[in-house]
């Protein structure tokens, strides 16, 4: 079985951001050079030897664990991300 890398997961998250019309970067620099959070952005979060999918809150004041799985292995998160994409595609087909 091929190793799941951080780059693999980043590519999947980029796909999710594009599918949902959300910003691809979690933060961008404004005219004053300060970082501004990008509401709606999906991104990876690493802690406790694992990884999870977070989304920036609407006001850019924090994040939440989208999949509510906590920090899991890269392989497990890859499976969860593919399931998440399947769910997005089902909703798109409904419209």
Map each language-model feature to its residues.
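Short beta-strand micro-motifs enriched in acidic
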Residues: 45-47
């Amino acid at each position: 079985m091929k190793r799941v890398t951080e780059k693999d997961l980043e590519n999947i998250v980029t796909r999710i951001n594009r599918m949902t019309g959300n910003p691809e970067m979690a933060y961008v620099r404004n005219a004053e050079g300060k970082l501004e959070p990008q509401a709606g952005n999906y991104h990876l979060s690493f802690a406790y030897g694992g990884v999870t999918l977070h989304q920036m809150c609407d006001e850019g004041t924090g994040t939440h664990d989208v999949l509510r799985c906590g920090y899991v292995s890269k392989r497990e998160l890859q499976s969860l991300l593919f399931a998440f994409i399947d769910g997005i595609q089902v909703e798109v087909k409904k419209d």
